[in-house]
Regions:
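A short amphipathic helical element positioned immediately N-terminal to and/or at the very start
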Residues: 1-12, 87
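Short, strongly hydrophobic transmembrane alpha-helices
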Residues: 12-42, 50
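Membrane-proximal extracellular/periplasmic loop immediately following the first transmembrane helix
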Residues: 34-126, 130
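Small-residue transmembrane helix packing/gating motifs
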Residues: 80, 196-270
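Hydrophobic secondary-structure segments that place a key small or acidic residue at a functional site
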Residues: 129-223
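A cross-kingdom feature of multi-pass membrane systems that activates on extracytoplasmic/periplasmic
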Residues: 258-296
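A hydrophobic alpha-helix feature that marks transmembrane segments and, especially
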Residues: 302-309
Length: 309
């Protein structure tokens, strides 16, 4: 009898242990997913430091030498520089364009996932440093206004023309750089340099902006904006951005722009390659970097857990 009683107790104990293990696993899984979504919601609630509403990217292509429309005379340095200025002017003058910006390369294109970092340190004390995102922008355009950047001090909207880009050592940074490198002191007018490049230049901070997010679900980061005056060889790598008046930002905008500007932007050997809204760019980046996929996986796990509990 004692043996039978003992066996029954052990069987019940094993059954209870398995129930406890299952509940513990379910709790851990639920906690993991709830924590993930809590962090996502928190990160997305933070200011992004810039905006993408009504912003479009204009990509220009360059005819190959094998094209029947290619003109060799348009590829020399003087012609390239002149054509670059004409492209910018025609984008600025398009009806409904409120601001136009140009920046160099993929890494200077917001929300594409491309990344190019730079270290910044107090030139007088390089132990105080911060690694930040690097953007190279054409100061004759209004890149900062296109993406609605704002001052760290009072939140006012920023224009690229607010700063003295005539100084070849000019740099504009963000609040995180100021705080990490200079503490409570203002960074404006102070010298910074890349601590990892001993032979590199020393920059002078011309302004401090709000920190920006690389992605919507990431924390705000520091950034540095430097001027680029592209050479003829660098011009084909430039990207162009326009922010349009909400009044013309209807579904017909893209079709109308392509129809008219395909002719207007046929400058030298350049042609209009692609016009993409930032809504589309952000959606594509979220998908390609797994953000959309992560959501789907965790939502599926949540549904599976809910059905089985």
């Amino acid at each position: 009898m004692w043996k039978i009683t003992w066996i029954q107790l052990m069987n019940r104990w094993r059954s209870n242990v398995w129930v406890c293990v299952e509940l513990l696993l379910a709790f851990c899984l639920a906690w993991y997913m709830v924590d993930y979504f809590f962090v996502e919601i928190y990160n997305r609630s933070l200011p992004s430091g810039r905006g993408y509403a009504n912003v479009w990217q204009v990509e220009m292509g360059l005819l190959p030498e094998t094209s029947p429309d290619y003109r060799a005379a348009e590829s020399d340095s003087i012609a390239m520089l002149g054509n670059y200025e004409r492209i910018k002017d025609r984008l600025r003058d398009y009806p409904g364009v409120q601001a136009m910006g140009a920046a160099s390369g993929c890494y200077s294109t917001p929300y594409t996932g491309c990344y190019y970092g730079i270290g910044l340190a107090n030139a007088a004390d390089t132990s105080k440093r911060e690694a930040v995102m690097r953007y190279e922008i054409d100061p004759t355009t209004d890149f900062l206004s296109v993406f609605n950047h704002s001052y760290a001090k009072d939140g006012r909207p920023v224009s690229t023309s607010d700063f003295d880009w005539g100084d070849p050592r000019a740099i504009v940074t963000t609040r995180m750089v100021e705080r990490k490198v200079f503490g409570e002191a203002s960074a404006v007018g102070r010298e910074v340099k890349d601590p990892f490049d001993e032979e590199g230049p020393t920059y002078i901070v011309k302004g401090v902006l709000e920190d920006i997010k690389r992605f919507d679900n990431s924390l705000p980061q520091g950034a540095a904006f430097l001027a680029i005056r592209p050479s003829a060889e660098e011009i084909p790598e430039m990207n162009y951005f326009i922010r349009i008046d909400p009044a013309v930002a209807g579904p017909r905008f893209a079709d109308t722009f392509r129809e008219k500007m395909s002719r207007e932007l046929r400058v030298g050997n350049f042609y209009l390659k692609r016009l993409t809204s930032y809504e589309r760019i952000k959606a594509d980046t979220d998908y390609s970097f797994g953000i959309t996929y992560d959501y789907r996986v965790r939502m599926a796990l949540m549904a599976f857990l809910g059905l089985n509990i």
